[in-house]
Amino acid sequence: MALFLSHKEPLYRWGVWKMDESVDTLLDLLPEREYYEREVQRFVASHRRLEWLSVRALLFRLLGEHKEVCYQPSGKPYLADYSYFISISHTKGYVSVILSDKVPVGIDIEQYGQRVHRVAHKYMREDESVRLYKEDAT
């Protein structure tokens, strides 16, 4: 099981999943295997299948139950039963999910590199950015 990192707070919970399993292994981690086998066939590209299943495996790991993820026309995800606010992100080899039953949430992960530094001002406060650069220097 490739749960890389998870965290739970009173208002939200989130996790990051390293995508290193096969489609078949991911299907074994999920309840209602037939449902997921059928749904994953919509994707032609193998990396999209792994990404889609990894998000569902992480969601199941965070909640302990099957939840259907739907998408608004804008692409924003939501749960079919509206039990939680949800946000999903992915980058090379990883997916992340954040959930809250109380407040809207958002999450974004990026592969670490120079691009992160170029756009850091868009998503980090100044004190966070200073800390990031100090950590890079050590």
Describe the role of every protein-language-model region.
Residues 1-138:
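Core catalytic alpha/beta fold that binds nucleotide/phospho-ligands
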